């Protein structure tokens, strides 16, 4: 049964990741007196799962949001690749996600991230037209060509619309080697 599987997965993530991680982040924000900033991207379906199965986890994210040191990015509601297939469906999902973030976290996202961090200049222009101030995309070495991902770039023809590149090396260290003590 998929409901049982969803609950088991969410329970495991809550126990092993979300609750201990959010506790550490809350402590860091308090210890740094608001100088420590965080950005999350949580799909609409993930928010729904938390609402259904682990409202305590959702509450921990809401408490983080209340610090004023946490922002939520927007994305497609279902973490879909709708940009590649239908602009109207893409826009519908982005608006749906913005509304969910507003309802749950009392924020209006200013930065967008596409599924799998897929980027093209046309997407940046489209997203800027929806009122976003920036987009997060993959910071691959083939794109950077020796430049740093720790800099905000501009999308061609979009003035002050920011393009943020994921620091792949640091992100991979955190995701795959965080607990490596060797």
Task: Show the residue positions of the predicted features.
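Catalytic alpha-helical scaffold of carbohydrate-active enzymes acting on polysaccharides/glycoconjugates
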Residues: 1-110, 117-172, 178-182
């Amino acid at each position: 049964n998929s409901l049982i599987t969803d609950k088991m997965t969410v329970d495991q993530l809550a126990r092993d990741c979300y609750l201990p991680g959010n506790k550490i982040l809350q402590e860091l924000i308090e210890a740094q007196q608001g100088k420590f900033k965080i950005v999350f991207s949580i799909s609409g379906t993930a928010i729904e799962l938390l609402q259904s199965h682990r409202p305590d986890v959702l509450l921990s994210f809401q408490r983080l949001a209340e610090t004023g040191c946490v922002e939520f990015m927007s994305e497609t509601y279902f973490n879909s690749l709708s940009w590649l297939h239908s602009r109207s469906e893409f826009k519908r999902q982005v608006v749906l996600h913005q509304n969910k973030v507003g309802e749950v976290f009392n924020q209006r996202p200013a930065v967008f991230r596409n599924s799998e961090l897929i980027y093209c200049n046309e997407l940046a222009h489209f997203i800027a037209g929806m009122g976003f101030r920036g987009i997060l995309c993959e910071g691959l070495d083939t794109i950077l060509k020796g430049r740093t991902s720790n800099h905000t770039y501009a999308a061609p023809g979009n003035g002050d619309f920011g393009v943020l590149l994921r620091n792949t090396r640091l992100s991979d260290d955190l995701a795959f080697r965080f607990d490596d003590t060797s």
